[in-house]
Amino acid sequence: FAPGMVSQKCLLCMCKLESGGCKPIGCRMDVGSLSCGYFQIKQPYWIDCGKPGKDWKSCSNDINCSSKCVQQYMKRYATHYRCPLNCEGFAREHNGGPNGCHSSRTLKYWELLQKIPGCKGVK
């Protein structure tokens, strides 16, 4: 995984939750638009993270590029919206988009992440 403010362990847990075991699963329809790859990244998220790699879909299916996108997205939004700078804050921001860390609708995502073996209480 790419280095950054999100811990490697937190990235692994997010990756496992998003792609059923941290796999390059391609694109799937999710709430009316495509989500792709290891972290199920949508095109607007990829644009917001600075458009790393060749293009959105290939970046999403490359573990280094997609984790770099997540790190850059958090650098941009988690600090701006004063999210807790821990795995819960990052995971909820990833799930809910800008300011998602403060939304009650992202609590279920965090609860699901903690049920993954080895992810309970991850920082």
Which residues fall in each region the model found?
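Short acidic-hydrophobic sequence patches enriched in Asp/Glu that either
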Residues: 6, 33, 105
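Short, functionally critical alpha-helical segments immediately adjacent to catalytic or ligand/cofactor-binding
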Residues: 5-23, 28, 41, 70, ...
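Residues that flank catalytic or metal-binding motifs in active/ligand-binding sites
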Residues: 10, 34-37, 90, 109
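N-terminal, post-signal-peptide region of Sec/Tat-exported proteins
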Residues: 26-54
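Extracytoplasmic/periplasmic copper-protein system
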Residues: 119-123
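N-terminal prepro-regions of secreted/extracellular proteins
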Residues: 1-3
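Alpha-helical segment that forms one wall of the substrate-binding/catalytic cleft
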Residues: 43-103, 110-118
